[in-house]
Amino acid sequence: MKKGVICIETEWQITTQQNKRSINTEPLMNFLQKLDDVPCIYRRVATRDELKYYLKKFHNKEFENYKIFYFSFHGDTHEIALEGEKENLSLMELGDMADGLFEGKFVHFSSCRTLLGSDENLKDFVEETRAKLVSGYTRSVDTFYSAIHDIALINELLTSTQIKPLLERMYKLYGGLEKKLGFKTSDELHV
């Protein structure tokens, strides 16, 4: 069975006025499904409880071939923002919620600045979750450019078996874009 993608995205309705384009990542998942028959699951969450519900559900055996977790949220240093919560969710809290779900999987944060800051926090997240690779951005990102990079990255993650050559190909093809977005991976930390 093919590797699949689980996309979890926050609700944007509270900031719709600021998000004039009212963009979400569901069309990216539809594109992957139509392009190469990639199994994709798309879910929207606004609260910790909703996120926790889906993370628990994805522990079921039927989801074991979904090797990529794609999180689309607002973000800040080592955090993601759930639209229905006052406080951001730290990566460590997310790791606790996941309860082993990310082990051996690829985890990508398509959110502003989530991987900004101390490498120790990212190392701790990788060690706790045992994720195969964690990636994301260190800068405030433009939706258009991050969507281009995200779809290219997910395609590489779906088709590649080795991380180093995958990341080298990505840099060769999209190095300028990666610099613009502040793309960062746990592979750089040799975790």
Regions from the PLM with identified roles:
Residues H74-G104:
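A short, glycine/acidic-enriched catalytic loop
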Residues V45, F71-S72, E83, V107-R113, ...:
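Short His-Asn-centered micro-motif
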Residues H59, G95-G100, F125-V126:
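Leucine-rich repeat
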Residues M1-Y66, E103-S110:
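A domain-level signal for caspase-like cysteine endopeptidase catalytic cores
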Residues R21-L28, Y54-K56, G84-D96, S118-L122:
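Well-ordered, non-membrane alpha-helical segments in soluble/globular domains
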Residues E62-D76:
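Short, well-structured hydrophobic secondary-structure segments
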